[in-house]
Amino acid sequence: MGREGMQGGESGRHRRGIEWPTVALAVLIYGGFALLTFHHAALPAWVFAPACAWLVAWHGSMQHEILHGHPTRSRVINRAIAIVPISLWLPYETYRQSHLRHHDDDRLTDPLDDPESRYLTPADWRALSRPARLLLRLQKTLAGRLVIGPAWAVSHFFADEAVKLWRGDRAAIRAWTEHAVGVAAVSFWLVAVCGIDPAFYALAIVYPAISLLLIRSFAEHKAADGVAERTAIVENAWFLGPLFLFNNLHAAHHERPTMPWYEIPAWYHENRARLLQENGDHVYDGYGEVARRFLFRDHDSVVHPAGVRADLVTSPR
């Protein structure tokens, strides 16, 4: 399978000019966010909260797009577009570095080497308490992922980052210092300028936004012997596909990680037969099928089915 570069970063992308659809998307997201939050008092909460949560989730998808080297040739400009932390919790630089490691496809789903793996090693599983095991098992259902997943993801991310900061990790310190400045600015806008209750913003907007993004990640990868078989495709996602910037066609993204989002659907349809052959027909007919199959049933096991192989134990972190 052809790749544009192991990690799909800016160095591996085809050099092009300004990608105006992505620039327009950024204007839409930030402009919509500013208007919604500034005029929130004129809207009922049941309109404001879902609309703003959608924009925060869309912003997360845009950050994913930008870290792959879009929409300009300038990393400084791209970073300036992506770095505003309207979700509050995730430093952009931390996410960027982690996600690019995820694009080492030979290690996909590996609980030791893939930073986005949802699997545990047998040793890690045995070390967990019974309540923790239950919470992880529940998150193997779509319902559990949506309800429990955001709290689990954020709390464990904070715990891991706190360890890095305590140990004096310079990269983590830089990322969090930069992030703190952005959070202060966004918080000033939300609270001092717009008068939004911080608890309401966190619980009614950020939490559902994370849940929306977890719909995409829920079934996009599964352990398999063949590398290509580890990445799924969700077709006919006419509603959520644009929210995810067509990353629901995930096998296409992993093969061409630097391809701009608006080119993915056409490229996917041109290469559909080959992609399905390579990934073993690991495809879903929309997120409705994902929900019907896995809303209350496990999508996969918590422990990686291969256990711990010698090459996993000795591979570099």
Report each predicted region and the residues it spans.
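Aspartate-rich (DDxxD/NDxxD/DxxxD) Mg2+/diphosphate-binding motifs
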Residues: 61-80, 106-116
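Helix-boundary and loop/linker segments of multi-pass membrane transporters
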Residues: 40, 70-75, 126, 233-236
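Membrane-cytosol interface motif
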Residues: 78-87, 229-244
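Non-catalytic, topology-defining segments of multipass membrane proteins
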Residues: 1-55, 85-199, 262-317
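Short helix-capping and inter-helix turn/linker motifs at the boundaries of alpha-helical repeat units
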Residues: 74-76, 178-179, 240-241
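Short active-site segment of divalent metal-dependent hydrolases/proteases
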Residues: 67-68, 106, 224, 244, ...
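Transmembrane alpha-helical segments that form the membrane-embedded catalytic/substrate-channel core
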Residues: 54-66, 91, 95, 145-157, ...
